[in-house]
Structure formats: structure tokens, C-alpha cells
Amino acid sequence: GAIQELSTNQDNILKNGFWAANQQAERPANFNIGLLRKIEDVTSQVLAGIAINQDEAARAKAVAAQIAKTKEAVVAALGEERNNYVVEISSFYNGNQFLAMFYEVYRDIRLVGTPPESVGKFGGETDNWRWPRHTCDFSMFRIYANPVNKPADFNPANKPFAPAHHLP
């Protein structure tokens, strides 16, 4: 995963762990995070022109074509924001409802910390899939955004993402 990609033979953070002493020491990770921002019912657009009495294979083909057409229209309606979003259209209730999920995609993700593997592997049994299982398998990443809190490519001037809501 992401930590393996950041590890090298000279700096094996997978084995030795890593904790950034400050934000400048955080390491850019090679993945994106999508935050679900909106769900829109697009059933009428997807099922427009689909005959009720079609056989299953023909209906599936027609629905797939309508989903692609609807997705294209929905993405185009985003205007300049379309580069910051991924839209997925999913089928619900056996193809009787279709919802478009709008994910705002943040591309500047940085590793803050991960413990050394020795914290989770001790006692000679590293893969105990039975309880009790004692391990410390986690890592911390921070999302960065541009000065107006919107997605941006990596830039040292980016600021930590400020969520609208958080746990107290």
C-alpha cells in the first residue's frame, strides 16, 4: 500500500515506523481520498426510453447506455468543478432506482505517522487470526487543500483540510 510505496531500503518506514515532527516533514502519499458530497436521484434520466417489456439482456444493455449518457450529462453540469469530482451512478432495488453519488476528490494526501511493525508483531505469532489478537496496525494521513479548502495537487503552500464537521 501507501506505506510500502514510501519505504526505501535506506528508509524502511514499514519496518521502522515514521512520525512527522511537523507538517513540513509529512510525506506525500500516492493516492486520493473522495468525500461523498451529494446524492442525486437520476432514475428518471436513466430509465427514460427504456421499454418495460424488454428481455433482460436487452434491458441491461439499454440501461448501461443510459447510465453512461446520464453520467456524462451530470459531470458536464458540474462545469469547472468537474475536475474535482468523481461521479458514480449505482443501481438500487433491482434496477428500479438509480442514484448519482458525487465524490469530491482530494489529491494532496500526506503520511503523518505509522508505528513500526514490531509494535504489532511480537511473541512469535504474527498472523493470529483468532482472538485475542493484539496488533497495532494503523497509519495516520492528513488531507491537504488549497487556501479556499478545495482539492488541489500537491503544493507545499496547501493547508490542512478543514472539515465542516468533526468529533468534539
Where do the model's predicted regions map?
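Terminal presequence/propeptide segments associated with secretion/organelle targeting
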Residues: G1-P168
